[in-house]
Amino acid sequence: MQALLFISYGAILGASLRWAIGLLFNPLFSSFAFGTLIANLLGCLIIGVLLGFFWQFPQISSEWRLFLITGFLGSLTTFSSFSSEVVELFFNDKWLNGFCVLMMHLFGCLAMTVLGIWIYKICSQLLS
């Protein structure tokens, strides 16, 4: 039961941030939901930093991992929204736009995760 509370508290914060990002960035472009991309890229950057941290400090309580990764980042990033936005572009015969959004999410998120790991490694070396 305690694990569920940690996940839930993280999810409240992650979903709230995702909603705010959507409100802020989605109106910028009419062709696709820019907020979803920002949320996914930011989430992948943060998960990269957290992966580096948890790899270096495996003794950190599993509750933090549940709170930050499963709860917060699980609700901040949104594969289902991304998927529906790409499919909607395809169904509206906007194949190039859909493919571009697909590639931005895929390669951007992978790159941000790697960047997050590198940022953590550099920061941990500078601080030690």
Curated annotation (Swiss-Prot):
Q: Which GO terms describe its molecular function?
A: fluoride channel activity; metal ion binding
Q: Does the keyword Acyltransferase apply?
A: no
Which terms does the UniProt entry file under GO BP? Answer: cellular detoxification of fluoride
Q: How is its activity regulated?
A: Na(+) is not transported, but it plays an essential structural role and its presence is essential for fluoride channel function.
Give the reaction(s) catalysed. Answer: fluoride(in) = fluoride(out)
Q: Which InterPro entries match?
A: FluC (IPR003691)
**Where does the sequence pass through the membrane?**
5-25, 34-54, 67-87, 99-119
A GO term from the CC aspect: plasma membrane
Q: What does the record say about its membrane topology? A: Multi-pass membrane protein
Coiled coil segments of this chain: none
Q: Does the keyword Repressor apply?
A: no
Q: Alphabetically list the UniProt keywords.
A: Cell inner membrane, Cell membrane, Ion channel, Ion transport, Membrane, Metal-binding, Sodium, Transmembrane, Transmembrane helix, Transport
Which subcellular locations apply to this protein?
Cell inner membrane
| Residues involved in Na(+) binding | 74, 77
Report the protein's function: Fluoride-specific ion channel. Important for reducing fluoride concentration in the cell, thus reducing its toxicity.
Write down the HAMAP family for this protein, in alphabetical order: FluC
UniProt record similarity statement: Belongs to the fluoride channel Fluc/FEX (TC 1.A.43) family.
Q: What PANTHER family has UniProt attached to this entry? A: FLUORIDE EXPORT PROTEIN 1-RELATED
- This protein is called what? Fluoride-specific ion channel FluC
